[in-house]
């Protein structure tokens, strides 16, 4: 066994109704004034006010910033940072899905150390602890509440930049399954399959370890056996709890094992065409699972049995059975059949032709190759391979 290292330096509270623990945790943090960074949907539903009221119950003031889009931009980080500094807040509550989490982490860096989030792009460029941060996810999910990454879109170059630093890990996380029951079916599907892919890519990564494998296996089992139920009925609290716990385990797993070609390739798709992150991942997954099948050394069977209603045994299993099972799962939960459909579903300017998409394949592949995840994909990949995979996904 190769040497591996792990550290999980967070305080994580998990349980139905655990949002009520926010005042206690905020007091433990020592905060007096919060900026709640969330999204417009949660604000409309009254959940942002509910969080603010919890803080007010222990005399903690709360301001809010909810002007956050999917695939949040450098400009959004600038606006949220200005709000934080103007408000006089001394800690941040990230309340929502991956977009508010990414923005909150970036604000925590820029508010403390100045400059632009682009100054911290890459690995280990954050000089020290950031503004204290409490993360409360409302999707299952990105796992962002337990990861050391913030992904922000830089529209000036159609690029999703990543800030990677253990300094941006939230100090506290609250996982309340009741909060994810309000998600529309499409959001539940996209976020749920994203969480599954976190576990799947971490599991087959060349950087996987016994520690990450144990978490990834449990995550895939929880998500794979419950995602259909949860998308069908978000009020199924048992399925919601399984999805949220699975997302948590997947987030920790890929923090150590990293990801692979799916995430490396999906970020450019979102940057160029504004496709939701989970949807971009999902339409790429079967294509890349087929590509990686040559490098499988037994793990595909485990993944298959986590998502297929009909179990298989080693003597009858073929890796292509997993590819078919992935396609079946994606169809069942309403994921678009291919990248062309996903891009057109996301388009705000009319039909995007296959020729237009083809013209972006080379620059997308160039950007995908910049991702560190390519290096740990189980099958080696050159730029020409990435271009080929994009074309197969169309």
Please describe what each predicted stretch is:
Residues 1-29:
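N-terminal amphipathic/basic leader segments beginning at the initiator methionine
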Residues 202-328:
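Active-site segments that bind and position negatively charged phosphate/pyrophosphate groups
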Residues 19-22, 44-47, 74-75, 99-105, ...:
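Short glycine/serine/threonine-rich phosphate/pyrophosphate-binding segments
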Residues 112-208, 299-302, 306:
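A glycine/threonine-rich phosphate-anchoring loop and its flanking beta-alpha core
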Residues 310-394:
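C-terminal charged capping/lid subdomain of soluble metabolic enzymes
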Residues 20-35, 54-58, 86:
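Glycine-rich phosphate/diphosphate-binding loops that line cofactor/substrate pockets in enzymes
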Residues 43-115, 229-240:
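N-terminal small/polar loop signature for handling phosphorylated ligands or for N-terminal nucleophile
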């Amino acid at each position: 066994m190769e040497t591996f290292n792990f550290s999980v330096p967070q305080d994580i509270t998990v349980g139905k109704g655990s949002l009520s623990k926010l005042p206690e945790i905020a007091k433990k943090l020592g905060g007096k004034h919060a900026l709640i960074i969330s999204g417009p949907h949660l604000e409309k539903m009254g959940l942002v006010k509910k969080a603010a009221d919890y803080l007010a119950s222990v005399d903690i003031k709360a301001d809010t910033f909810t002007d956050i889009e999917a695939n949040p931009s450098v400009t959004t980080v600038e606006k949220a940072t200005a709000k934080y500094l103007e408000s006089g807040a001394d800690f941040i509550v990230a309340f929502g899905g991956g977009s508010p989490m990414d923005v909150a982490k970036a604000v925590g860096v820029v508010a403390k150390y100045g400059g632009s989030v682009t100054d911290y792009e890459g690995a280990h460029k954050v000089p020290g602890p950031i503004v204290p941060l409490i993360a409360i996810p409302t999707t299952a999910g990105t796992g962002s509440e337990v990861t050391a990454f913030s992904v922000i879109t830089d529209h000036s170059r159609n690029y999703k930049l990543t800030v990677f630093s253990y300094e941006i890990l939230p100090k506290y996380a609250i996982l309340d399954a009741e909060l994810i029951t309000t998600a529309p079916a499409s959001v539940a599907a996209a976020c749920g399959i994203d969480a599954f892919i976190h576990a799947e890519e971490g599991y087959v990564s060349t950087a996987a370890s016994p520690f990450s494998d144990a978490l990834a296996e449990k995550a895939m089992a929880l998500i794979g056996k419950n995602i259909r139920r949860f998308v069908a009925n978000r009020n199924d609290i048992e399925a919601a709890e399984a999805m949220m716990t699975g997302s948590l385990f997947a987030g920790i797993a890929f923090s150590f094992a990293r990801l692979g070609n799916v995430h490396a390739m999906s970020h450019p798709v979102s940057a160029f065409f504004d496709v939701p992150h989970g949807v971009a991942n999902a339409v790429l997954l079967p294509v890349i699972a087929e590509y990686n099948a040559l490098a499988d050394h037994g793990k595909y069977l485990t993944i298959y049995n986590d998502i297929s209603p009909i179990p298989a045994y080693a003597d009858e299993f073929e890796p292509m059975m997993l590819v078919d099972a992935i396609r079946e799962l994606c169809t069942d939960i309403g994921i678009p059949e291919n990248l062309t459909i996903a891009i057109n579903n996301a388009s705000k300017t009319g039909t995007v032709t296959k020729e237009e998409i083809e013209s972006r394949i080379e620059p997308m592949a160039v950007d995908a190759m910049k991702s560190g995840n390519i290096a740990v994909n189980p099958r080696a990949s050159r730029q020409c391979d990435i271009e080929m995979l994009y074309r197969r996904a169309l």
